[in-house]
Amino acid sequence: GGCRYFLGGCSEHSDCCEHLRCKMGLNYCAWDGTF
């Protein structure tokens, strides 16, 4: 359970915590530009 934090590994956006999204191809969570 739980969400992935900044630079955490991911396979889709829903893996990442709020305000983060999965960078496709690089497979880590990055800030999505929102607050």
UniProtKB/Swiss-Prot annotation:
The modification Phenylalanine amide is found at F35. InterPro entries: Huwentoxin-1. SUPFAM superfamilies: omega toxin-like. It comes from the Eukaryota. It is found in: Secreted. GO terms for molecular function: ion channel inhibitor activity; sodium channel regulator activity; toxin activity. Disulfide bonds join C3-C17, C10-C22, C16-C29. Transmembrane segments: none annotated. Its main location: secreted. Keywords: Amidation, Disulfide bond, Ion channel impairing toxin, Knottin, Neurotoxin, Secreted, Toxin, Voltage-gated sodium channel impairing toxin. Belongs to the neurotoxin 10 (Hwtx-1) family. 62 (Vatx) subfamily. Negative results: does not show activity on TRPV1. Gating-modifier toxin with weak activity on Nav1.7/SCN9A and Nav1.8/SCN10A. Inhibits Nav1.7/SCN9A peak current (IC(50)=334 nM) and shifts the voltage dependence of activation to more depolarised membrane potentials. Shows 21% peak current inhibition (at 10 uM) on Nav1.8/SCN10A sodium channels. This is Mu-theraphotoxin-Pm1a. It comes from Poecilotheria metallica (Metallic blue ornamental tree spider).
